Amino acid sequence: VEIAAAKKWLALGGFAGREHDSFGSLSYGEQRAVLILRAAVKCPAILILDEPCHGLDDEYRQKILDLLETIAESGTTTLLHVTHDPSEVLPCEKHILELHPGEKPMYKIITSGK
C-alpha cells in the first residue's frame, strides 16, 4: 500500500497527523475506525462489516457511520454491512435484506439513494 494512500484514508477518518500513534493508545472507537481504514486503504471490491458500531458510544457510532458512507461513496468498494440496528442503515445503501426469525426475508432495492 502506498504511504500517500494510507495518509489520505487516515485523514478522511480524522487521524491526520496521528500516523505514529500506537494502536494501544487509541480509544476503542478509534481502534474500530483504524481497523476499518486499514481494510479500506486496499480498495477492496467488497468490504464485509459485521456490526461495525457494536459497543460504541453515540459519538463514535456516528463517526463510524460517516466513515462507512465515505468509503461507499468512493465508488471503489461495495459495503456488505450487517447490523441488528435499523438506524445504522446508511443513506447510500441501495440494497437491503431484512431478516426476522421464522419469517421470509424481505429484500428492498432503494432506487433513489440519498
What are these model-predicted stretches?
Residues S22-L26:
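Conserved ABC ATPase signature
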Residues E2-R18:
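Conserved ABC ATPase "signature" region
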Residues D57:
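ABC-family nucleotide-binding domains
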Residues C43:
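Conserved catalytic motifs of ABC-family nucleotide-binding domains
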Residues V82-H84:
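H-loop/switch region of ABC-family ATPase nucleotide-binding domains
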Residues L47-E51:
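Catalytic Walker B motif of ABC-type/P-loop ATPase nucleotide-binding domains
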Residues I36:
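Hydrophobic anchor residue at the start of the ABC signature
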